[in-house]
Swiss-Prot record:
Keywords: Chaperone, Cytoplasm, GTP-binding, Nickel insertion, Nucleotide-binding. Belongs to the SIMIBI class G3E GTPase family. UreG subfamily. GO terms for molecular function: GTP binding; GTPase activity; nickel cation binding. Homodimer. UreD, UreF and UreG form a complex that acts as a GTP-hydrolysis-dependent molecular chaperone, activating the urease apoprotein by helping to assemble the nickel containing metallocenter of UreC. The UreE protein probably delivers the nickel. GO terms for biological process: urea catabolic process. This is Urease accessory protein UreG. The keyword Ion transport does not apply.
């Protein structure tokens, strides 16, 4: 049976997790990748509805599923990811020719990480408007992520944030782990992010699955 890569996408409330999914999905499809999308909210499925509206005509809405976790966001993707695992398995069974499942967590703090039982890799999204000190806070979510996305870079001059400082601090806390600066409104950095996903997640994981 084909192994479908599972990629978690986490980060604080409002950092742009949903926006990242909305901008990378069309590019993945253009490159021949068949995605599924699962979003998490605590008491609604609002993110799934938003993604369906944005990707209408691009991705079949049946391939977008909202999970109402009713619990702390990191609990639903780390301590007890059973609800999300069930959702992933359901979607994979319905669409077995898919290549990747994008699993968006609910918005949480810098401690959010994904259980390896749920995600093969994970991306952590922060945004410039949270302040340039965010990388220095050294939370496990942003430090351990396979890719760190620093989003909303256009807002830096409006909040007094230095992108150079954020990049320096990111390199200090993450070492050689990759990161990317993005603006989901203009598309800046998005193609590079997709290249990283294709190279580091999809291609590598597909090779491992066939060995």
């Amino acid at each position: 049976m084909k192994k479908i890569t599972r990629i978690g996408i986490g980060g604080p409330v409002g950092s742009g997790k949903t926006a990242v999914i909305e901008v990378i999905t069309p590019i993945l499809i253009q490159r021949g990748i068949k995605p599924l999308i699962i979003t998490n909210d605590i008491v609604t499925t609002e993110d799934a509805k938003q993604v369906k509206r944005t990707l209408k005509g691009i991705l079949d809405e049946e391939k977008i599923l909202g999970v109402e976790t009713g619990a702390c966001p990191h609990t639903a993707v780390r301590e007890d990811p059973s609800m999300n695992i069930a959702a992933v398995e359901e979607m994979e069974a319905r669409f077995p020719d898919s290549d990747v499942v994008l699993i968006e967590s609910g918005g949480d703090n810098l401690t959010l990480t994904f259980s390896p039982a749920l995600a093969d890799f994970y991306i952590y999204v922060i945004d410039v408007a949270e302040g340039e000190k965010i990388p220095r806070k050294n939370g496990p979510g942003l430090v351990q992520a396979d890719i760190l996305v620093i989003n909303k870079i256009d807002l830096a001059p409006y909040v007094g944030a230095s992108l150079a400082v954020m990049e320096h601090d990111t390199q200090v806390v993450r070492g050689q782990r990759p990161y990317i600066l993005t603006n989901c409104k203009t598309g800046e950095g998005v193609e590079t992010l997709v290249n990283m996903i294709m190279r580091d997640f999809l291609f590598t994981h597909s090779l491992q699955a066939t060995q």
